UniProtKB/Swiss-Prot annotation:
It comes from Vibrio cholerae serotype O1 (strain ATCC 39541 / Classical Ogawa 395 / O395). It is found in: Cytoplasm. GO terms for biological process: 'de novo' AMP biosynthetic process; IMP metabolic process. The lineage of its organism: Bacteria, Pseudomonadati, Pseudomonadota, Gammaproteobacteria, Vibrionales. The gene is purA. GO terms for cellular component: cytoplasm. It is an enzyme of class 6 (ligase). Homodimer. The active site is at D14 (proton acceptor), H42 (proton donor). Plays an important role in the de novo pathway of purine nucleotide biosynthesis. Catalyzes the first committed step in the biosynthesis of AMP from IMP. This is Adenylosuccinate synthetase. Gene3D superfamilies: Adenylosuccinate Synthetase, subunit A, domain 1, Adenylosuccinate Synthetase, subunit A, domain 2, Adenylosuccinate Synthetase, subunit A, domain 3.
Amino acid sequence: MGNNVVVLGTQWGDEGKGKIVDLLTEDAKYVVRYQGGHNAGHTLVIDGQKTVLHLIPSGILRNNVKCIIGNGVVLSPEALIKEMSGLEERGVPVRERLFISEACPLILPYHVALDQAREAARGKKAIGTTGRGIGPAYEDKVARRGLRVGDLFDMASFAEKLQEVMAFHNFQLEHFYKVEPVSYEAVLEQAKGYAELLTSMVIDVTNELDAARKRGDKIMFEGAQGTLLDIDHGTYPYVTSSNTTAGGVAAGSGFGPRHLGYILGIAKAYCTRVGAGPFPTELFDEVGDHLGTKGHEFGATTGRKRRCGWFDAVAMRRAIQINSVTGFCLTKLDVLDGLKEIKICTGYQMPDGSIAEVSPMAADAFENVTPIFETMPGWSETTFGAKTLAELPQTALDYIKRIEELTGVPVDIISTGPDRNETIIKVHPFSA
């Protein structure tokens, strides 16, 4: 039985993880975020009501679930408080359900200023970050100058550390990027305002999760972004600044890796990508427009239009290798309704004429790659809202089976709409 389940994206993010986490948390006691920051955008639709979460784990709407923000997450106090307020206005008792690791690095206003100044300076070579300070906060963590949630317990010491790090970053902002420096006094006053709230939510996350495991409590680890955006294994440099893969779970939460059970890979029935970077199966025709319009492909965090393309089994094989995926959840199957034919990328023809069955890693290696497609018949029937396999047309079942054959991994869950009830569960991860 998979008591400890990891839910992560196997593409370039935006795969529909939030809905699936919310659905599966009916059986969980804990939901843990282990990487990323408020650059994530997890959309939940419950009985028609839409909720978008950026930082708080997607289990927060369940009254039986403890939600934890692990040490691998870079935490923006401003974003957290805004998100908490929105939920509390709707009657969600966030403070009773949400807990934070004291080792979470803080995202502060100078990180945001740096992020935006750098993207502007890159011009046409911009990476396409969300501009929310995620990358600079991770840089400070690795450089060992970052401030953490635990530093807020001693504000005198915090003020000294803040002054030192801001002198360093303001020098860059003024003299290299030629923009206004960030006010030290303003940042310090801001920090004094939220220190009590954040420190009141701190727990020993490793100890809490280990005790939960020993009790047999079900724990879910919620990934943000997607495998192909991983800082180490993604299409570098067009990646995020954290480990979005299964390997990030242990490092970003302090939970022992040997105790992880089922790895659920979330994948759209087609592919999307936000921002710059390689995308071999990208469509520039009316089919791409159809996917974008019908799939409402606009980022939950940035509002940016997503690039759309066919399902890429080559990139998926790389994601499976990295994450040791147990089973897939295939989302947005209904977006393919009405297409006469559907294509799957089964290989890449490389510039030297060789055929790659697993995608390269660095972005440069994707240059002049030609996708090799297999064409399958589409279906005219609607799959929207289907709750059983019997409701799916045979051609849709054939498409799902072909994905299983090409990847070697079973599709255990199929999502046919945004609501948590619009789902077909063949194998439940907590029962696998």
